[in-house]
Regions:
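Signature of the SF2 helicase/ATPase Hel1-core->accessory helical subdomain module
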Residues: 66, 72, 92, 97-100, ...
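Walker A/P-loop
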Residues: 48-69
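A substrate-engagement module of RecA-like helicase motors
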Residues: 2-25, 30, 77-208, 269, ...
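Conserved RecA-like ASCE P-loop NTPase motor core of nucleic-acid helicases/translocases
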Residues: 80-89, 422-423, 499-511, 633-635
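N-terminal pre-P-loop "Q-motif" helix
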Residues: 28-46
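A contiguous, basic/glycine-rich beta-loop/short-helix subdomain that forms a polymer-engagement track
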Residues: 175-210, 219-228, 343-474, 481-488, ...
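Conserved RecA-like P-loop NTPase helicase motor core
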Residues: 459-460, 471-481, 533-639
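Conserved helicase motor "Helicase C" RecA-like lobe of SF1/SF2 P-loop NTPases
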Residues: 506-533
Length: 665
């Protein structure tokens, strides 16, 4: 007999235990002790109101474990639960697979909905407006055809979101028709009753569980501090893939201004060369068009200054800049244009025009404020820098971020909600079996102060499934002879695994040099090389890798984590260097200086734990199921030569380790 707790909810054992609801429904379900332990702890945290950090090894089934806690609260009617993920893949897994599976076995019903950012939804009123103005809004081949395809889709779609659209429209076309906060007539709109965005919002209001991504969660947290919101009220937060939240918070609590973004914004208002844009049709808009031309000219001068500064000085400083490092000839021009659009909004009799003008004025106002903020460097505790990218180094980004995002996250998240559960396969930099101490580094980075921790190890048999090879005789990675020696070692291990390998780097420059040295040899061995940065995006590289035998993928940062290749396609992961962050990045430099000022040793309190967590992520690419087997190879001899090296080995699951000398292999 299965006992229910009524308004107390549904306990973890009743759902996931050996004789629970899931096991009764699916005979092939294996009740895992680690999953059950995690589910109980999540349930306890949410019932008793404390924060919890859980490191759940690969194969634990952590989504079922935290969903058990969420369902318990939903059935007990204790409040709405927000589940946040970093990747779309995990969102889809939750909404399309895991949650429906549990809805199937839980007699007391609960509802779950996926939350998308407002810009993912079509606005029918703006679609009509764009259709009327299309000859002047769109200039490139195919854009008007895309608009027609969107209009046809709008008649049949139930969802009205970009992911439901069968074509991939250009950013210009979608921006002209997407739902926007400052460009919404609300209940006054003739389409309000059938509005895709508001329909989705109403379903979120009634859902027990909302699934969102980290970017949407932090947008909501930032807006709530200003008295607004993009999500309905929720009472509990579960953050999966939580190791990414520091980086997401950097973006949301910092500044990001792109040269392309400014030019694109101005072009959408009026492109002087093509005579297209929102202001192109109105003979009364000549003054505003002149202001757009002036903004274009000022932007060219401004970014030419930035580019010259970077070439002469900035590159040596890693891009870090001082206040007023270039003259501000742009923000006052943006202000003039903003005031011009505000004036036009007041004078026009066309309500649709009015909303468009007001929205652009808001965007210009935000840009103007951020530009002044960046140049004056008004925020204490932030670092400001310039990034220059692209083949001709013409993509310019102005960036700022807090040196310590912890206080920001603490204030907006941990102080606001009684129970926040954070989970990932890589949160702790301590050894297996260690409890809270290993989590203190992560907790300190994200402002998590009063919390409990759980390390739920993997159910996989790593001692049987993995062999770790360490090249103990290779030169130090900073030695000039390292790349040549590393290439010879890479050849050995690729022959041993027949390709089917990830080779993980910490820099593009070393990746490119290694690829150039090995390209012909790989061709001779009939192994196909996929090198990141050669034109294919990450998703296409992965699809290609999985479908081809004897494939070798060279990857940097984005391939160390969040990549899932189960089965024989991936049998070898080669880690070229221990993944210490490059210390010449302004943000890393600033954090190192801050720690020195606090009297700490930045290597042991920041650089080493960061590298250990990333090393765990790289190691974790190999074993994704209980039948996977293979090797992990470390070419960085510091892991056996330096006293700190043993901390890397202690942090990964226990497996067979072999230190190889040049003669041994």
């Amino acid at each position: 007999v299965i006992a229910f707790a009524g308004q107390e909810g549904l306990n973890a054992d009743t759902l996931l235990g050996p004789e629970g609801l899931v096991a009764a429904k699916w005979p092939l379900f294996e009740s895992r002790p680690q999953q059950l332990e995690m589910a109980r702890k999540v349930q306890q945290a949410m019932r008793q109101g404390f924060h919890l950090a859980v490191e759940a090894g690969t194969g634990v089934g952590k989504s079922f474990a935290y969903l058990a806690g969420a369902i318990d609260q939903a059935i007990g009617q204790k409040g709405k639960i927000l589940i946040s993920t970093h990747t779309i893949n995990l969102q889809q897994q939750l909404i399309e697979k895991d949650i429906p599976s549990l809805q199937d076995v839980v007699p007391a019903g609960f509802t779950a909905r996926l939350a998308k950012g407002r810009g993912h939804y079509l606005c029918k009123r703006r679609l009509e407006y764009a259709a009327k103005r299309q000859a002047l809004l769109f200039d490139e081949d195919g854009q008007q055809e895309q608009l027609a395809a969107i209009a046809a889709w709008a008649e049949t779609t139930q969802d009205g979101s970009l992911s439901d659209l069968t074509i991939e429209p250009s950013p210009t076309v979608w921006m002209a028709v997407q739902s926007e906060h400052g460009n919404c007539q609300g209940r006054k709109c003739p389409h309000f009753g059938k509005c895709f965005y508001w329909k989705a919002r109403r379903t979120l209001e009634t859902a027990d569980i909302i699934v969102a991504n980290h970017a949407l969660l932090f947008s909501d947290l930032v807006l709530k501090e200003a008295g607004a919101a993009v999500l309905p009220e929720f009472q509990f937060v579960i953050i999966d893939e939580a190791h990414n939240i520091e980086h997401v918070a950097e973006d949301h609590f910092g500044i990001r201004i792109s040269q392309f973004g400014i030019i694109h914004l101005l072009d959408r208002l009026f492109n002087p060369r093509k005579r297209k844009g929102l202001l192109a049709y109105d003979h009364k808009a000549e003054e505003a068009r002149a202001l757009v031309r002036q903004c274009h000219a000022s932007a060219r001068v401004f970014f030419a200054q930035v580019q010259a500064w970077y070439a002469n000085t900035g590159d040596d400083e890693g891009g870090q800049c001082q206040p007023d490092f270039v003259e501000d000839n742009l923000s006052h021009k943006l202000k003039e244009l903003r005031l011009g659009l505000t004036k036009m909004a007041k004078e026009t009799s066309d309500e649709d025009d009015q909303y468009e003008f007001i929205r652009y004025a808001e965007q210009l106002g935000q840009l103007e404020a951020e530009l002044k903020d960046f140049l004056k460097q008004r925020k204490e505790g932030c670092v400001y820098w310039v990034e220059v990218e692209g083949a001709k180094r013409k993509k310019i980004l102005l960036r700022s971020a807090p040196l310590d995002v912890g206080p920001y996250i603490k204030r907006s998240l941990f102080d606001e909600y009684a129970s926040v559960v954070l989970t990932s396969a890589t949160l702790s930099c301590g050894g297996n079996g260690q409890k809270k101490e290993g989590f203190d580094f992560f907790a300190g980075r994200v402002g998590l102060e009063n919390y409990q921790a759980l390390q739920a190890g993997s159910p996989f048999d790593y001692e049987r499934q993995v062999r770790l090879y360490i090249e103990g005789d290779l030169p130090d990675p900073n030695d000039k002879s390292f790349i040549e020696a590393a290439c010879e070692s890479i050849k050995k291990y690729l022959l041993k695994s027949g390709g089917r390998a990830f080779v993980l780097f910490t820099s593009y420059s070393m990746l490119k040099e290694t690829a150039a040295r090995l390209e012909d040899w790989l061709d001779e061995q009939q192994m196909e090389l996929l090198a990141q940065g050669s034109g294919l995006d990450r998703a296409k590289m992965l699809t290609h890798f999985k479908s081809r035998p004897r494939c070798v993928l060279f990857g940097t940062d984005s391939f160390w984590q969040g990549v899932d290749v189960p089965g024989e396609s991936l049998s070898n992961v080669i880690i070229v260097k221990l993944p210490f962050a490059v210390p010449n990045h302004p943000l890393i430099q600033g954090r190192i200086e801050l720690l020195k000022q606090r009297g700490e040793n930045p290597f042991f309190s920041y650089q080493l734990p960061m590298a250990i967590i990333k090393f765990k992520q790289g190691f974790g690419r190999l074993i994704r199921t209980k039948t996977d087997t293979g090797m992990v190879v470390v070419l960085d001899s510091r892991i056996v030569r330096k006293p700190y090296g043993k901390q890397f080995i202690a942090a990964i699951p226990k497996c067979r380790v072999e230190v190889v000398s040049g003669q041994d292999f």
